[in-house]
Amino acid sequence: MQTKELLKLVENVLDERKGQSISVLDVIGKTSITDYMVVVTATSERHAKSLADYVLIAVKENGLIPLGIEGQQGSDWVLLDLGDVILHVMTAQSREFYQLEKL
């Protein structure tokens, strides 16, 4: 799967599952670890886990294996490393506190 296809898949799953304020950050040339970071707001910790789980299922159904997952159990920030795309699922409070888009 090409990077743009993966990015679109992630965005579609997040939108279908009611992720809020989906932001795609193009970090090509700014970091060597990924091409895109996706930041999305979840309505609760349970919703954050659910969003990450649905993306994980969709990615696996397309033959990809995630490189890493952090913060799945009772966390206000779940990180899913898909290689060329890194997904940050955060509650509104965490997103406001960390302000990843401003880095």
Residue ranges and their predicted role:
Residues M1-G29, T43-S50, I57, E70-G71, ...:
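Long, contiguous binding/interaction regions
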Residues E61-I69:
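Active-site phosphate-binding and catalytic loops of NTP-dependent enzymes
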Residues S32-D35, D81-D84:
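A short, glycine/Asx- and small/polar-enriched loop/turn
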Residues V39-T41:
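Short hydrophobic/aromatic beta-strand micro-patches
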